[in-house]
């Protein structure tokens, strides 16, 4: 999965997919009442990027729905996975469940079209704080209450705070999650970060006993870093330059080892070598 980073304006969906991304990451900010409000990152953000692009969240969802609904004039068949980077740092811990409920209602209405031929992309809810694990139950309970438990097949989870793997496992246990887990690791492209925790996550994924199904690394903009990440065995790389990742994947060392994921590749099933 080549994951386009910080895609917060509708026009950027096409821009990143046309550069080679089959997945995008979008920031979601919340208002004081835990309503998802804007697709907005803010300052500071990755070096070389404008941090200030935004849409109203519901408008972005409608644009995303168009891009991921077969038959729509804006349809992009390659776009199969969307990571919502939930900026819950602005919320009190006791608002996490409420944020999950509201997120579910927004997605159901504006993205899934109330279960009637909505967008088809898989969705990852990425949460920065382990203490906000109740967001997951708020989300899953709401989809069930609204009569659409089947849509949970399209939803996965990520805790993005670079916490110890054991602590993340405990948070999922509390949230009642087993499966559909992506594990992120990384840091802004302005700084360097080693791959030791990525390797721990890959080992957990491949052990058959861990909680992780897929691993992604961010933010990967350079060819050398891309090679290191692929060599470490990640499933996804989040990038500002999808074309750089695509180029590296076409190099002799990789072109017979890795390929771009398609809609038929489940993002929840651990790839067995």
Curated annotation (Swiss-Prot):
GO biological process: killing of cells of another organism; lipid catabolic process
Catalytic activity: an N-(acyl)-sphingosylphosphocholine = an N-(acyl)-sphingosyl-1,3-cyclic phosphate + choline; an N-(acyl)-sphingosylphosphoethanolamine = an N-(acyl)-sphingosyl-1,3-cyclic phosphate + ethanolamine; a 1-acyl-sn-glycero-3-phosphocholine = a 1-acyl-sn-glycero-2,3-cyclic phosphate + choline; a 1-acyl-sn-glycero-3-phosphoethanolamine = a 1-acyl-sn-glycero-2,3-cyclic phosphate + ethanolamine
Gene3D superfamilies, alphabetized: Phosphatidylinositol (PI) phosphodiesterase
Tissue: Expressed by the venom gland.
Active site: 41 (nucleophile)
Disulfide bridges in this chain: 45-51, 47-190
Protein location: Secreted
Cofactor note: Binds 1 Mg(2+) ion per subunit.
InterPro entries: PLC-like_Pdiesterase_TIM-brl
Gene Ontology cellular-component terms listed: extracellular region
A GO molecular-function annotation: lyase activity
Positions of transmembrane segments: none
EC code(s) of this entry: 4.6.1.-
Pfam families membership: GDPD_2
Keywords per UniProt: Cytolysis, Dermonecrotic toxin, Disulfide bond, Hemolysis, Lipid degradation, Lipid metabolism, Lyase, Magnesium, Metal-binding, Secreted, Toxin
Record's function text: Dermonecrotic toxins cleave the phosphodiester linkage between the phosphate and headgroup of certain phospholipids (sphingolipid and lysolipid substrates), forming an alcohol (often choline) and a cyclic phosphate. This toxin acts on sphingomyelin (SM). It may also act on ceramide phosphoethanolamine (CPE), lysophosphatidylcholine (LPC) and lysophosphatidylethanolamine (LPE), but not on lysophosphatidylserine (LPS), and lysophosphatidylglycerol (LPG). It acts by transphosphatidylation, releasing exclusively cyclic phosphate products as second products.
Family named by the database record: Belongs to the arthropod phospholipase D family. Class II subfamily.
Protein name: Dermonecrotic toxin LhSicTox-alphaIA2bi
